[in-house]
């Protein structure tokens, strides 16, 4: 079996702790044949992070691409990708990022609704889940129609936080 992982974040993303080099070595140790780094690039900037929380640093696109590209001669196959979040909230920026480099793989993600915080930060007690999820799937559909990525990721992203907060939700 050929083992791959195409959704990996490094220290270029604020939600990860390992360098690209460390992740290549760990992947090789785990007998993974091929990986693709897809660090976060949020097209809506820090607008989805509430005041009082640490804002994400500006993504260093050139530095990121150079660092990952330098690993192409690793003991395993290494691809250069990116996770574009909230593409439809800033299509001109998304287009600029997509045109910047010959990406091997692009994830399209939706971590927050337009003019809302990332679901990670939202308190959902007392919130009616049906309209929230309807809005989410409508915006996810808009992202799917945009169709400038390899894979649409996190299809049920809000559900993770709904359950984490002890709420139940039936998608049917």
Enumerate the language-model features and the residues they cover.
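Domain-core and long-helix interface of multi-subunit machines
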Residues: 14, 100-101, 107-172
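Alpha-helical protein-protein interaction elements
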Residues: 29, 56, 93-97, 128, ...
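Glycine-rich anion/phosphate-binding loops
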Residues: 15-22, 89-94, 130-138
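Short, charged beta->alpha transition segments
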Residues: 67-68, 93-96, 138-143
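An N-terminally biased module of ancient metal coordination in phosphate/nucleic-acid-related enzymes
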Residues: 1-88, 98-100, 159-171
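Short aromatic-enriched loop/helix-cap "lid" or pocket-rim segments at secondary-structure transitions
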Residues: 48-49, 93-94, 119-120
């Amino acid at each position: 079996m050929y083992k791959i992982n195409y959704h990996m974040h490094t220290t270029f993303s604020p939600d990860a702790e390992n360098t690209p080099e460390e992740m290549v070595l760990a992947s090789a140790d785990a007998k993974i044949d091929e990986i693709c780094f897809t660090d976060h690039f949020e097209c809506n900037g820090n607008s989805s992070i509430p005041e009082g929380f640490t804002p994400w640093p500006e993504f260093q696109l050139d530095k990121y691409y150079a660092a990952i590209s330098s690993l192409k001669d690793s003991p395993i196959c290494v691809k250069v990708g990116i996770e574009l979040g909230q593409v439809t909230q800033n299509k001109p920026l998304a287009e600029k990022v997509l045109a910047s480099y010959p990406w091997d793989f692009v994830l399209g993600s939706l971590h927050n609704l337009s003019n809302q915080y990332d679901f990670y930060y939202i308190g959902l007690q007392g919130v009616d889940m049906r309209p929230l999820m309807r809005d989410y799937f409508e915006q996810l559909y808009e992202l799917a129609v945009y169709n400038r990525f390899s894979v649409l990721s996190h299809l049920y992203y809000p559900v993770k936080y709904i359950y984490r907060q002890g709420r139940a939700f039936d998608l049917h």
